[in-house]
Amino acid sequence: MKKVLFYTLLVIAGISTANAQEIFSKSLKNGIPVHITNNRDKAFAMKAGEAGYDAKSGMAAYTADEIWYLVGNADGFRMYNHALGKKHALKLVGNESGAAATMASEKEATLLTITAQEDGSYAISPKDAPGESFNMFGGAGKDIKLYSSGDKGGHWNFKTIDMSRTLEIEYNADLDGALETNYKIGEIAISIDGQKGAIIVDRNNIPKSTKCYLPKDAKVGISCKKAYHGWKMNVNGAEEIAELPLPEKGLQVAINITADKDNRYQYLYYSPDEKGIPYRIPAIATTANGYVFAINDYRPCGNDIGFGEVDLVMRHSTKAGEEWDGTSWTEPVKIADGLGKEATETWLTGFGDPAIVADRERNEILVMSVCGNRLCWHGNYGAGTEQNPENPNRMARLRIIYNEETGTWEATEPEEVTYDIYPLFKDKEGKAHVGSMFIGAGRIAQSSMIKVGDYYRIYCAVWAVETGSYRHHNYALYSDDFGKTWNLLGELGNDFNDSPAPLGNEPKCEELPDGSVLLSSRKGYGRYFNVFHYTNFERAEGYWDGAVATDQVGNLKFGSNDTNGEPLRIGNVLFQSVPTGNNRSGVSIFYKELSDDPATYTPTELSNGWKKIQITDRESAYSSMCILPDGNIGLYYEEEPGGYSMVYVPVEFDKTLDTMTYCCGLPFRCSICKKGLEMIFITIEDPIEE
């Protein structure tokens, strides 16, 4: 009966029983080699781990660990792997969703079945649990575990392999001159009958050669176009070999690798890491004594706050002041450790989206963070019920302080400040106007003019959801005690439409030359700009102009991507980083010269007169900027590979801006060299095309 049912399913799928049976072997000795790729993420293949380790998925490279033998028949078979031989086979540790597939001894192997799908792919299931299927659990590139066989991520395609005709790749590598941080070299793209796969090359384990086992009568192409920053690659002296039929005797090629000694891009974190955990959300700052700090999310849960554990990690330059070289960094340190499911208090579940500022006088960094277990859209401050108790998107604060005695930086434990900030958004009747919010991640701005008490004033802006609705908008906050207490900049207003940016997404602030404050908020095609003008600096009294869309009233415009970016002012030049593609790609820095007339500091005037410098043409997203110890800009941003790796690059604008002279006020007096580097005058040459 089972055989009749299986035959019917194969007919529906449009595949003959004879063809399907070609993937099965009666014994391992005369086994039919099979390559298995995911039907949804077709560039990813099923790979064996080492003996005793979980099977996994990865970009298809057609190497020995991707070649399988299905010994048995459609009613029941066991899976062996070419790299491990006949003593090991695939074993499931259970039959329920989430059960891992490991490479165990032959005696422990799990009996499996396949079920054909309407699109011609197959679900691979334990015989005792046909409702579950092998799945790239958590997404492409993750370990193989069981999940519902109805999920399309658990459907697979089979190709038989001709083991006699191989693609053999030899490697010639000259690694001298590479930056220490850039240990991944790039992807060697392999195209098999139009289907893409890749071998990722790492300088720490470059093999002498790689042997790839290909399908019968395959056409094969090879490309080295995707070298990562810091490296150059070619295949047989060219960028690529176009797809062609595999010769009878196979194909041998040479991959030549050299370090790009002119490269200045550095990967502070490749994403995902070796555990499959991604990084995201960059923030960068330069301290008073000239250290550069890079802080970002580390996401064991794989996603934003609200999905589980998220941590904050930091690296900083090992040198500062005159000794700063911009190329050497400390090892990563976790400064806020989310506890995920182990959290005994809600706010300790995770910490993410760092917003940071380094004080211009003290060797101290303030880090503000969203925290907790609530998705940003679902916070309900002021609207809790018995069925849905109040649980807003929570907020935390920590500091990183320089120990003068030890010469090291020490982070304080995070502390929750949720209920220090949310009450700012209640009106006189006690009604909450904001149900959920977080501070725009990246750089918190610090005034160079306004000092009330011991600290110069700092500014941040919040993404906020109106209580009782899903409408997001922005407000700005300021602090005169370096984040100990916060106040609303401007009036709360009566409703959503009275906010500084009624439709704004993730926002940032920057001070303009007269002390007024620019709000720059995320939107597709451009930014929302608004400006707060002071009538009294000390009491922080003043008014907002009204938000404008820069792409509608000016020339700060780009593709449809809707992505976090950052404004930064150096003297009389205003910068704005943001991706420029329709998708998240092409992170660039826009810039414009500011007039010395405060009457021009309006949202509409500030939307005009921009020019652009493209930093990357690759997939890229969020970004943050700081002024480096040498007066140039440090850009910390998200870029492929992964979604996303964290990339730092110094940008020397004296070689790229239009001809002008600008005054660069460094944010520190160097406590090491004691030279008081407070003002630098740079003459700009070599204008570029807009």
Task: List PLM regions with ranges.
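Lectin-like carbohydrate-binding module/patch detector with strong preference for beta-trefoil
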Residues: 21-164
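A short, amphipathic beta-strand motif
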Residues: 167-177, 181, 190, 255, ...
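Short, ordered, surface-exposed loop/turn motifs in non-cytosolic proteins
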Residues: 46, 175-201
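Asp-box/BNR beta-propeller blade signature and adjacent active/binding-site loops
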Residues: 262-669
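Bacterial Sec-dependent N-terminal signal peptides
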Residues: 1-21
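Surface-exposed interfaces of beta-sheet-rich extracellular modules
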Residues: 135, 215-241
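Short, solvent-exposed S/T- and G/P-enriched segments that are highly enriched in secreted/extracellular
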Residues: 194-214, 237-248
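Conserved "repeat-terminator" motif of extracellular CCP/Sushi domains
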Residues: 165-172, 223-225, 242-262
